[in-house]
A protein has these predicted regions:
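Charged, terminal alpha-helix-loop-beta segments
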Residues: 1-225
């Protein structure tokens, strides 16, 4: 508070950086998986900008609970929900990004390690969330696109994005998985990749692209699919 009063902004920023460093150390030391994912999300935001394959523009986006845009899916023919006629929820997506090559809006679900692939909030559950809210609901897709265009506009005004950055709203939103390897050696990474593919097959979501992230590298690259 005293730094703010003296308008010593350089010292204020330096002190804030120290506080943020302590915050990220605290996150690293937490055992809860979701906190590790939030830490990874932060690193992804820093690493994925207009100079890379994807520009991340938003995190933890929740689909509106308004009637026109809520998740509403009838998955009776989908093996991942046998016997269920109607399933409704308000899904939240980890990452919203724009692919810089074609300006397509992308929903990206981040997974850290093999334990994150199954059960509640597993890859099948995330596929359901996308299919029931965006892929099958034009109103939901339009709502999200318009909201992200507003985010882009605000970031341009704040000089966080270049003036010529845009979303191609004619292209349908794409769903992608991002998987962060726990292993560092090639044999371990191959085993994780094979396990991911098996879980994709079990969850009937083989049609979605997976971008793999090496340990300590948070750049989303289409060459790592």
């Amino acid at each position: 508070e005293s730094l703010k009063k003296t308008r010593d902004y350089k010292t204020f920023i330096d002190e804030m950086k120290k506080l943020m460093d302590k915050y990220w150390i605290w996150l690293y030391n937490e055992k809860h998986r979701s906190l590790h994912e939030k830490d990874t999300q932060h690193a992804l935001c820093i690493s994925n900008t207009e100079s890379t394959d994807y520009t991340i523009i938003d995190l933890e986006f929740q689909v509106s609970t308004r009637k026109d845009c809520i998740y509403h899916y009838e998955p009776s023919s989908i093996p991942r929900h046998p016997g269920v006629d109607v399933y409704e929820k308000s899904p939240r997506f980890d990452i919203i990004a724009v692919r810089n090559s074609d300006r397509r809006l992308c929903v990206i679900e981040l997974k850290n390690g093999l334990d994150a692939l199954v059960g509640k909030s597993g890859i099948g559950d995330h596929a359901d969330s996308f299919e029931g809210s965006i892929a099958k609901n034009p109103l939901a897709e339009l709502m999200i696109t318009k909201e992200m265009e507003k985010v882009v506009s605000d970031k341009k005004r704040l000089k966080l994005l270049s003036d010529d950055f845009y979303i191609d709203e004619k292209l349908p939103i794409e769903f992608i998985y991002a998987y962060a390897f726990k292993s560092e050696d090639e044999n371990g990474k191959k085993a994780e990749r094979d396990s991911f593919l098996r879980e994709q097959e079990k969850a009937c979501c083989m049609n979605y692209k997976v971008i793999y992230l090496n340990k300590g590298d948070f750049t989303l690259s289409d060459s790592n699919c």
